């Protein structure tokens, strides 16, 4: 089998660097600490972090302990700060300390566990405050208990307090201002400790949300901060798949499982080697499109595991081996995601190892 038969994922590291620079300009004096969790949103944490380090990034965020250990190994002797959003989960202490990872502590038991881990010397930590998302994080009243009990923090160097915005992609949502006020109040209990609130969307909410550090993710990788294309953000990943066969479906006949689409006229159809096993959502039909031969072209029928059908009527360029763009430089990932009722986050992170990655613009 050759690469020409596979889904091809082209990752433009120069576009990544452009997006990082655009977000740094938005951040003002605040640090920009990239989120490279989920294998850098499906694009490869090692080469992505490598390029972002070259562009000036010195702090990174991952979700899982294993991601942090792998990133530390990838970065080698470079003195990056790697924050682990899961925090100090049961049994993780030795591995966190061994890889010099900084847990984002999410609960009083995690604080206590990390304090115990620090029995042989002080350890770095960040504290996560829940300001209204109601996932992970210390409630403000728990933070008050914590700062009032010196023993719980005596072995820890708390260097950062963070929270996470639930509705940053909707600037007018009232929860943004509510979370900002709660975060300001909570952070005031830890004077001198650096603060971090803004994700990708938060960077576009205004200066008040930036504080000392920002943590962009999806907008580094080509997704707009409000779930739609943004002029400051370039596509980083272009995903293509080959046409396997071109056929004419006669009027009155249907395509695919469940006979989900029926031809109203004789229709020239390309069968493309991409399906939900390659990250194309099953929900992409009936609104899904691809880019081929200079235009958007509709998907026809249900998405199957390995295949989609595309209308290529009056398109002479459609032939076996020709590559169809699923999203990327011509079809923004936000638009492709919206057509399937999902987000750029999901479209990117669902890219699978079945696709062949190719790095351009500064690859290792």
Curated annotation (Swiss-Prot):
InterPro entries: Ala_racemase, Ala_racemase/Decarboxylase_C, Ala_racemase_C, Ala_racemase_N, Ala_racemase_pyridoxalP-BS, PLP-binding_barrel
One Pfam family recorded for the sequence: Ala_racemase_C
Domain of life: Bacteria
SUPFAM superfamilies named among the record's database cross-references: Alanine racemase C-terminal domain-like, PLP-binding barrel
GO terms under cellular component: cytosol
EC number annotated for this UniProt entry: 5.1.1.1
Claim: Isomerase is one of the keywords in the record: yes
GO molecular function terms listed in the Swiss-Prot or TrEMBL record: alanine racemase activity; pyridoxal phosphate binding
Amino acids binding substrate: 135, 305
Active-site residues, Swiss-Prot/TrEMBL: 37 (proton acceptor), 257 (proton acceptor)
Sorted UniProt keywords: Isomerase, Pyridoxal phosphate
Catalytic activity: L-alanine = D-alanine
Pathway connected to this protein: Amino-acid biosynthesis; D-alanine biosynthesis; D-alanine from L-alanine: step 1/1
GO BP: D-alanine biosynthetic process
Its biological purpose: Catalyzes the interconversion of L-alanine and D-alanine. May also act on other amino acids.
Protein name: Alanine racemase
Taxonomic source organism: Caulobacter vibrioides (strain ATCC 19089 / CIP 103742 / CB 15)
Gene this chain is encoded by: alr
């Amino acid at each position: 089998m050759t690469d020409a038969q596979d889904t091809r994922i082209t990752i433009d590291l120069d576009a990544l660097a452009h997006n990082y620079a655009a977000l740094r300009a938005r951040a003002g004096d605040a640090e920009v600490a990239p989120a490279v969790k989920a294998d850098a949103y499906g694009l490869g944490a090692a080469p992505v972090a490598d390029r972002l380090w070259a562009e000036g990034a010195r702090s990174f965020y991952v979700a899982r302990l294993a991601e942090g250990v792998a990133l530390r190994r990838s970065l080698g002797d470079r003195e990056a700060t790697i924050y682990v959003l899961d925090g100090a989960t049961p049994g993780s202490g030795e591995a966190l300390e061994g890889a010099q990872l900084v847990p984002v502590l999410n609960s009083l038991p995690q604080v206590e566990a990390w304090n115990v881990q620090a029995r042989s010397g002080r350890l770095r930590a960040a504290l996560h405050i829940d300001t209204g998302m109601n996932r992970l994080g210390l409630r403000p009243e728990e933070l008050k208990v914590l700062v009032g009990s010196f023993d719980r923090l005596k072995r820890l160097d708390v260097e950062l307090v963070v929270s996470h915005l639930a509705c940053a992609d909707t600037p007018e949502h009232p929860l943004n201002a509510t979370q900002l006020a709660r975060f300001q109040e909570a952070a005031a209990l830890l004077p001198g400790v650096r603060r971090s609130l803004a994700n990708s969307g938060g960077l576009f909410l205004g200066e008040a949300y930036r504080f000392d550090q920002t943590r962009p993710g999806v907008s580094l990788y080509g997704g707009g901060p409000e779930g739609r294309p943004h002029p400051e953000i370039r596509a980083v990943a272009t995903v293509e798949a080959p046409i396997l066969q071109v056929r004419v479906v006669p009027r009155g006949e249907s395509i695919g499982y469940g006979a989900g689409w029926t031809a109203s006229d004789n229709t020239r159809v390309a069968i493309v080697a991409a399906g939900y096993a390659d990250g194309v959502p099953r929900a992409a039909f009936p609104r899904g499109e691809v880019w081929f031969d200079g235009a958007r072209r509709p998907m026809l029928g249900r998405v199957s595991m390995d295949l989609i059908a595309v209308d290529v009527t009056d398109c002479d360029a459609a032939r076996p081996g020709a590559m169809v763009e699923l999203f990327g430089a011509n079809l923004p990932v936000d638009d492709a995601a919206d057509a399937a009722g999902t987000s750029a986050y999901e479209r990117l992170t669902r890219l699978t190892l079945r696709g062949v990655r190719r790095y351009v613009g500064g690859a290792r």
